[in-house]
């Protein structure tokens, strides 16, 4: 039993009912060594155990950013550096010797917010729900199937596929083989559509979790990982403050997407009327729409910043938000119960931090699929709650207390917000009162523009920032959203060289800096471009575009032109054409009597004949006869055609002693017909087949070159490969 009450020297106990073990949590907890008692206990955090001997979770300890040569900096200052990812980082100052980014990062969950008045909280949540109903139009909120949760919906805005390169979560990371990472080993498919692979640990955990959420709140295990990002120098050399992000199990993320994908789309689509600005395009006329909305009630803005926002949300508030979302989305009793149990799970969980296991009570994990949307809803609820509480305590009339939408204009993105307050109520609702009200339940709010200020004062919109961008009015319609210069200039000092050379990464950053600087001053942007061309001999005019290209970019954005995100329209204007020409090819294209290419939409590789050898390009199958089938997978290079990088071609396709060439050479020797194939067209397999032919045999070289010549007519026009790659052929 358990003690439940007491008084006047007497205690009262209650028998505990039999508790059903949570199976999906046990599969993870079998890797834990739980301490006899909790250590380092706080309101929202406690050290409860450690990973068993031999169990290790890898997290990056070296930055992916590479410092550029001095000449690349173009005389501009650097106010940011890569964050501290290891306790052995030599940049850690002496006065914080022993600083550990893992341990410091988890502390944001130590002190969640206090208790809110239940009735008032649900009252303002109902107000928010009413605002959703007012703009719901023809949106519906059905649960999507697992295939849609994985693949998204083609050509439907804000219904993208699940990120496949990110971590699979705990405990699945423990089964990685050397070189494996991400979610792909738990998926299988033809390169366009994927499904969850049967028999894997993720599929088993998914089935278990699906059953569990219909009965109770599941127990989650997250991995806390330091974030590799560029931070202000004070957060490195003065007071180190590395942020951590949470990696949640893949099966949990899939189920959350199934239940809430349509709700997220609704919030993003209706940002024109709702406070949440997730999905906003700062280059378009949307920024002006935000400015005009805020100034509808005046130009007195509270620019707010929360302290440790990620760790604030309590289970009380999460329960309220879950109820509100359920009431709004509808559905049967079972679906509502599943939704709420999923949301409540992320508020009470275990977190693996290096080798330690912590119990976390509160906050929203940053790796949660709904993180930014839920944070925005939480942010709005706090502001609305304080508004009503302050107004009532200040003696306002019931009519004034219910007039949030009349006196306030409000935009929010996660923990970022701007609150425009009508001068009519400045004496009843202002920064001082808001700061004091939030402090009562453990929430610290400061000035978002200058975090060192002890007070929170009204600012004109032109002196505010939102998403680290300012507001500059160019006309009645157009407002620019200049990004802070410190973030821009740092891009010339540090670049991410994943899958590209230092020069290519730098060029991309330089183009972005010029484009962003244009919003500060077209002259500054033009001067920087000229200086770069003058100081960097290897940089050509064609690589960074012209100032006219930059002007055209903004004109297109403001005209509502839907950009192709896979190309850079400033530098790659030739790529604005169609992806492919002509009709789909429904036959095998034979380059030679024994080497062909085809589209997997019209052919089934699983019915391969004995004398055929199929080369599957960019598929993800795990079971096939290696004497009949080979699979080629690569991370696509820059451009939009999906072709591999030059480095991959050299090390895999062109390396004579490599496994790929050996296997293809064997197939040729066995007199098999080799068929290169991919889903969605014949261009990629034709190029790959042509490369193979041009390198495999001098007698076949002519066929390979002829094939590549034809293919390159499309490839070059569409920008599928960079110019430097053509010398490979």
Curated annotation (Swiss-Prot):
**Reactions this protein catalyses:** RNA(n) + a ribonucleoside 5'-triphosphate = RNA(n+1) + diphosphate
Q: Which residues form the RdRp catalytic domain?
A: 299-429
Which UniProt keywords are present, listed alphabetically? Covalent protein-RNA linkage, Host endoplasmic reticulum, Hydrolase, Nucleotide-binding, Nucleotidyltransferase, Protease, RNA-directed RNA polymerase, Thiol protease, Transferase, Viral RNA replication
A GO molecular function term, named singly, is: RNA-directed RNA polymerase activity
**GO BP: any one term:** DNA-templated transcription
InterPro entries in UniProt: DNA/RNA_pol_sf, PCV_3C_PRO, Rev_trsase/Diguanyl_cyclase, RNA-dir_pol_C, RNA-dir_pol_PSvirus
Enzyme Commission number(s) of this protein: 3.4.22.-, 2.7.7.48
Annotated Gene Ontology cellular component terms = host cell endoplasmic reticulum
Q: Does the keyword Ion transport apply?
A: no
Peptidase C3 domain residues are 1-21
What residues correspond to the site Cleavage? 26-27
The name this protein carries in UniProt is RNA1 polyprotein
List the lineage, top down.
Viruses, Riboviria, Orthornavirae, Pisuviricota, Pisoniviricetes
């Amino acid at each position: 039993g358990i003690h439940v009450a007491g008084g006047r020297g007497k205690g009262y106990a209650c028998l505990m009912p039999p508790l059903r073990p949570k199976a999906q949590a046990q599969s993870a907890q079998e890797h834990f060594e739980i301490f006899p008692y909790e250590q380092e206990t706080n309101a929202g955090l406690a050290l409860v155990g450690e990973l068993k001997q031999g169990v290790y979770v890898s997290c990056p300890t070296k930055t992916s950013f590479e410092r550029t040569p001095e000449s690349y900096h173009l005389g501009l200052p650097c106010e940011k550096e890569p964050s501290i990812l290891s306790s052995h980082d030599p940049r850690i100052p002496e006065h914080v010797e022993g600083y550990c980014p893992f341990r410091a990062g988890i502390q944001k969950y130590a002190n969640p917010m206090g208790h809110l008045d239940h009735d008032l909280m649900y009252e303002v949540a109902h107000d928010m729900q009413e605002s959703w109903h007012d703009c719901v139009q023809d949106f519906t909120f059905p649960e999507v199937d697992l295939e849609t949760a994985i693949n998204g919906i083609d050509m439907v805005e804000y219904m993208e596929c699940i990120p496949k390169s990110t971590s699979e979560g705990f405990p699945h990371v423990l089964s990685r083989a050397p070189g494996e990472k991400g979610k792909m080993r738990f998926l299988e498919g033809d390169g366009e559509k994927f499904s969850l692979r049967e028999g894997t640990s993720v599929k088993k955990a998914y089935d278990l979790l699906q059953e569990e959420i219909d009965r109770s709140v599941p127990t989650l295990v997250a991995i806390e990982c330091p974030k590799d990002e560029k931070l202000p120098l004070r957060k490195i050399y003065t007071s180190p403050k590395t942020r951590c992000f949470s990696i949640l199990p893949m099966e949990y993320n899939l189920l959350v997407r199934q239940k809430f994908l349509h709700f997220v789309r609704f919030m993003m689509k209706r940002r024109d009327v709702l406070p949440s600005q997730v999905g906003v395009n700062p280059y378009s006329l949307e920024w002006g729409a935000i400015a005009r909305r805020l100034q509808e009630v005046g130009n007195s803005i509270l620019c707010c910043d929360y302290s440790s926002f990620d760790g604030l949300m309590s289970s009380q508030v999460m329960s309220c938000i879950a109820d509100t979302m359920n009431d709004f989305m509808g559905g049967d009793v079972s679906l509502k119960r599943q939704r709420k149990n999923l949301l409540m799970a992320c508020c009470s969980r275990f977190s693996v931090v290096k080798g330690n296991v912590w119990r976390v009570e509160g906050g929203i994990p940053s790796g949660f699929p709904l993180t930014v949307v839920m944070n925005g809803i939480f942010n709005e609820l706090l502001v609305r709650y304080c508004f009503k509480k302050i107004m009532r305590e200040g003696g306002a009339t019931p009519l004034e207390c219910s007039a949030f939408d009349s006196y306030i204009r409000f935009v929010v993105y996660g923990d970022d917000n701007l609150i425009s307050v009508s001068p009519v109520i400045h004496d009843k609702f202002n920064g001082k009162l808001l700061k004091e009200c939030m402090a009562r339940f453990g929430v610290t709010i400061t000035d978002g523009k200058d975090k060192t200020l002890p007070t929170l004062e009204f600012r004109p919109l032109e002196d505010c920032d939102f998403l680290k961008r300012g507001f500059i009015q160019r006309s009645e319609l157009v407002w620019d959203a200049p990004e802070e210069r410190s973030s821009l200039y740092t891009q010339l000092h540090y670049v991410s060289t994943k899958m590209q050379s230092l020069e290519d990464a730098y060029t991309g950053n330089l183009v972005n800096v010029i484009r962003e600087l244009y919003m500060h001053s077209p002259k500054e942007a033009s001067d920087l471009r000229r200086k770069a061309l003058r100081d960097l001999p290897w940089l050509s005019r064609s690589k960074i575009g012209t100032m006219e290209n930059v002007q055209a970019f903004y004109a297109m954005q403001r005209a509502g032109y839907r950009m192709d995100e896979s190309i850079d329209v400033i530098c790659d204007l030739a790529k604005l054409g169609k992806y492919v020409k002509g009709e789909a090819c429904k036959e095998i294209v034979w380059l030679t009597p024994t080497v062909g290419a085809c589209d997997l939409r019209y052919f089934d590789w699983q019915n391969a004949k004995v004398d055929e050898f199929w080369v599957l390009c960019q598929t993800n199958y795990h079971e096939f006869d290696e004497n009949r089938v080979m699979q080629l997978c690569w991370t696509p290079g820059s451009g939009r055609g999906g072709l591999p990088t030059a480095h991959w071609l050299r090390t895999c396709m062109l390396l004579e002693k490599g496994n790929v060439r050996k296997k293809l050479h064997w197939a040729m020797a066995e007199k098999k017909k080799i068929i290169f194939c991919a889903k969605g067209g014949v261009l990629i397999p034709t190029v790959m087949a042509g490369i193979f032919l041009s390198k495999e045999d001098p007698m076949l070289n002519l066929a390979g070159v002829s094939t590549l010549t034809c293919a390159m007519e499309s490839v070059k026009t569409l920008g599928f490969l960079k110019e430097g790659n053509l010398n490979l052929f």
